[in-house]
């Protein structure tokens, strides 16, 4: 019953894409309402947003978290792709500035999962790749300090979090690059593959990752959600969050391959 920023971010994302297709006023009104709720209820006044609120919209003092903020940025970008919207563009740029200040490790440029200084913090290679794609493919965000950071983060995440032989992407890393969770998740594989389409000189790696996704994760009845660190299937259900990652990955590949 709690109010999640993650959910509202995807409402914005979905409405923007749907409105682009149908141009129905009702759809745009839902988009506007979702944007207003985020601005009025979740915003903390410093460019960031609470990750979760109580069911009555009161604060839980949970603070901001990386993942819902990334999907909010994605929702803002989807909105700007279908209409001119100065308020949303300002919110997006303020978010990017605040993330650079509060979430980016200065040494490696990586986007941490929790704000800098939080206890038991970590970073996920998959999220570095996902952020890189969003930033590098956006005219609004390309060239910002956050874009420069995630360009560095891509290289560090690739070095420490991707197996050069199998193409496996590790789940969670400590800041020093040591593996905290070696679980291979299909969404991280898809995000790495999509991000590679924007990296010059990555054709050989792109082909390797395409094969790795096909051979290790996809099968005739769907997909393997997770493999363990040794490559054995560790999760057999197929959650509804995954097709979004696969669809956006395939879309990126289609644009890259023409």
Question: How does the language model describe each region?
Answer:
Residues 1-258:
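Glycan-recognition and catalytic cores of secretory/periplasmic carbohydrate-active enzymes
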């Amino acid at each position: 019953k709690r109010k999640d920023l993650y959910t509202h971010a995807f409402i914005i994302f979905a409405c923007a894409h749907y409105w682009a297709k149908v141009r129905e006023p009702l759809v745009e009104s839902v988009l506007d309402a979702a944007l207003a709720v985020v601005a009025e209820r979740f915003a903390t006044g410093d460019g960031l947003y609470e990750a979760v609120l109580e069911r009555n919209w009161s604060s839980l003092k949970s603070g901001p978290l990386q993942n819902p903020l990334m999907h909010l940025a994605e929702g803002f970008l989807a909105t700007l792709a279908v209409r001119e919207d100065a308020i949303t563009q300002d919110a997006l740029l303020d978010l990017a500035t605040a993330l650079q200040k509060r979430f980016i490790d200065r040494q490696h440029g990586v986007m941490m999962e929790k704000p800098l200084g939080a206890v038991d913090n970590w970073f996920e290679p998959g999220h570095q790749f996902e952020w890189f794609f969003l930033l590098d493919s956006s005219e609004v965000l390309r060239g910002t300090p956050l874009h420069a950071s995630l360009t560095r983060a891509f290289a560090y995440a690739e070095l420490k979090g991707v197996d050069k032989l199998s193409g496996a992407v590790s789940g969670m890393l400590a800041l020093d690059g040591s593996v905290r969770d070696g679980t291979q998740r299909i969404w991280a594989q898809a995000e790495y593959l999509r991000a590679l389409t924007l990296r010059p000189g990555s054709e050989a790696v792109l082909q390797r990752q395409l094969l790795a996704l096909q051979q290790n994760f996809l099968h005739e009845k769907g997909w393997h959600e997770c493999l363990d660190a040794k490559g054995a299937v560790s999760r057999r259900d197929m959650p509804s969050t995954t097709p979004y990652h696969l669809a956006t990955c395939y879309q990126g590949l289609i644009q890259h391959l023409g």
